[in-house]
Amino acid sequence: MPLRVPTRALAAALVLVAACRSTPVVVASKPFTEQRILGELLAQTIEDAGLRVHRKLGLGDTLVLDAALRAGKIDTYVEYTGTALAEVLHDARRGDASVIFATVRDAYAAADLEWMRPLGFDNAFAVVVRGEDAAKLKVTKVSDLGAHAAKLVAGVPRGFGDRADGWQAFLRAYGLHFTRVRQIDPAARYDALTVYDAFGSGASVDLVIGDTTDGEIAHRKLTVLEDDRGFFPTYEAAPVVRRETLRRHPELVDVLNGLGGTVPPDVIRQLNWRVDGEGQDVAAVVRAFRKAQR
């Protein structure tokens, strides 16, 4: 004899399912180009899975997004393992990529947050100098700066100094002493074009803390110095999602993990350059990238 499901119970269940499907997945990002690209990548991928998306791209920095995620104001964004380790967990440990990923994954799990598969690149901090200066001073690694630091002007983004992986800790690790340090506006910290304009005519700084995925580095013929003392941890990019969101939309596990390994370093540099260097629209750049992946 077939089971009878009470009409009211069935109706209530259908309403609940419909509500879950109609509730948009809130995708956020930090306010710099690479993050907007990655946020848009999440958004378009989720939309293609048949879910509605509400974009909050450029919402705020790491701590703003972390607080919003834990409070349920957003559902997902792309974070970097080394940033989570230093800024969120206040952990100064070092290790290979797998150790750092496991550390942040386990710590976030206690807050009901899930780290998905890394996207395929490590966006590490980098000490960047003009190519011609690197050749003239014969510097290839950060420790080579010791003999020249007193003559150089360092450009440091505001907010970088207080991190466990920040400026002061960096100076101590390398024993460097710069007599002139200029702070860069926070917006320029993540805007490769603005930061590296400092290397144009009448440059105000001689080196800057940049990102290894900045498209401007190659196009402006700048040089990244080797972090020969391994000061900076790895910064693998990966989506972080509320587990409540995954329970509501279980298909997101495969959808987001499917992005794992699809954005290697050379690709993210190209995408960053298309937006920062060529002025292309973020959404259009992501659509073209996804089309090429199919």
Description of each model-found segment:
Residues 55-67, 158, 179-195:
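Short helix-initiation/N-cap motifs at beta->coil->alpha
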Residues 42-49, 143-180, 288-292:
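Ligand-binding cleft/hinge of the Venus flytrap
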Residues 22-34, 42, 51-58, 150-155:
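Short, well-ordered beta-strand elements
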Residues 58-62, 72-85, 100-101, 202-215, ...:
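Beta->alpha turn/N-cap motifs
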Residues 17-19:
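C-terminal motif of bacterial Sec signal peptides marking the signal peptidase cleavage site
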Residues 88-116, 202-207, 216-230:
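Ligand-binding "clamshell"
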Residues 161, 165-176, 250-294:
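An extracytoplasmic/periplasmic, membrane-proximal ligand-sensing/linker region
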Residues 99-154, 243, 261-265:
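A conserved helix-loop-strand patch within extracytoplasmic ligand-binding domains
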